[in-house]
Amino acid sequence: MWRFDGYPGRYLDVCLSSGSLKEVQLDKQTLLNNIGGKGLATHLLTTRDTTDDEAYDLKHPITGDADPSIHPSTPLLLMTGPFQGSKVGSSGRAVVCTRSPLTNIFIDTYIGGDFGHDLRLAGWDGLFIHGRSDSMVRLEIEDMEVSLQDAESMRGMTTWQCEKAIDADDVFSIGPAGESLVRIASPITAGRRAAGRGGTGASFGAKNLKAISVTSTGTSRVADDTQYLGAVKKQRQKMGENRRVGDPFYRFGTSRGPIYAAQMARMPTINYTSATGAIFQNGQKVKQLDTVKLSGEYWHQAMPEAKQSGCCRPCPIACEASHRPSKGKPLHIPRTERPEYETLAMLGSNLGIDSSLDVMDGNDACNQFGVDTISSGALISLVCELAQRGWFPEEWAEGEINGTPAFISLEGELIAWEFGNPKLPPLALERLANPSGMFTILAGGAVACSRWVERETGHLATRLTAHCKGLDLPAWDPRGKRGNAMAYMTCNVGANHMRAGYKNPTGIPNSSALDLIPELIYSQNESVIRDSMILCAFASGATPDDVLVNAFNGITGDNASIEDLHLRANKQWNAARQWNVEHWLKIGVEARQQDLLSYRLRRDVLPDGPAAGMVSFVDDADESACLSEYYNLRGWAHSS
């Protein structure tokens, strides 16, 4: 079934307009040159982009800008890498890559679980999907047998309902938000594994593709068992050591983040008006959120019956936990997952909520309806701040509670747009998934929504958003954190916290990051290697370069050095950038301007904590110098 060591050597071309399903074979050198995963997806997207020029005639329903992302001809890719189908720890991954419906530029976003392994073991490096079906369909893959099945009866189903309805090893589906082209929609697998960023659920919906299911019986093929298994053994030994010494990550995953992030002034609070959990009104601190109560440690104390709920295959870390609640829980949830840090912050502290138990309902709503937790938190916090400032458009209000604008939930309850209201996130997301009234504007995401409000009311709503290139900021505030802003600004997808890291990410507060630029570029290329193999970022510490290289070479038969892999990764990083620049040229905007962070992060200082009084750079001159140095080292023109 596999044509080469380490690679099935083929992808499935799916034309939804015609119903055509074709095997497209890849040569071994192309596979090695692009590694796999993100690298292969980038290569295919940038060299085999099927987007018609007429796609630019489509206009975004809220902003009026060119909107080629949801045109039928725009391709949607789902790819695996050499580590899928292997025993390499923490390799339960797959990448979704397309033109983002949220930002209209390059997006790569990742899922955990078993889907990536099973797709590869079924005999496919990945999927290249284009066109649009006249009716709702689903793609069924059983090893090399592939078919399109009618899915009209599944229209309107949540992702949980889809997974229950389809008999397969793995199901990857959208909920009603994706069907409704909500620009922050996410496809979901295993009930809670989201391809979260960039609105790729709307990419599925625009193609009338409800789900992809995979069943596999195949086995992998490796070049050198001794080299490959030796690398796996070293990785497992390191992971075992970490567990034995009590590394809390192995028990709590990212959910301990609120405690650390608040101490370091990195945790978004009340729509990025603070970063320590402190709430301010008129310049005065009025409340301190309980970050311990918001953390996963409290979640476990409150739910002693909660258990480690398994892991992505195969992963010794097993960083998640779940709880099966009693009957009568809102939204009829069969099992509740412990939220990740990004969710605890964006649907917690960012909304003035400081209980991880309250955040669960919002998290589960995101998983059911298929929306991104980060962008959901950004959107809801924007609307709450609009209401707080008196900038809430009159035509949006469906009622008031004590003078605060409110909406009517699907159950008929009036819900106020106010910070600190734990009922707000799940019920607002339920309305967003099937948008009507004001929710048709909210469906565009926070940035598009702020632009609409500014255009229609004159209020400077765009100054209230935290983003780069239209992608909502993750739950790590860059102000006063040396080099963090540059990592967000130079990332091809927009603000993303998983594409770069520094050995000392905090450094000296409010000092220039100019000397960190070489390290930033190296780290970005390193992330391309990891995301092409594909390896979970949580395993990076247990997978040093020698282990990574030996695992890759042992699986594929290549003789690559880490330097070779960095050269390949650098090429892919630049290819994605060039693809973005070509888009910006078509719509008449300057690339350098697109790289800048939003107003809130460049102009609004933090009010307290170790970064009090600081913004994302020392000053505008420092920002410009850092960006120019980055362009120089990347070999980019200063205007691109």
Locations of regions flagged by a protein language model:
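Basic, polar low-complexity surface loops/patches
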Residues: 1-292, 300-305, 368
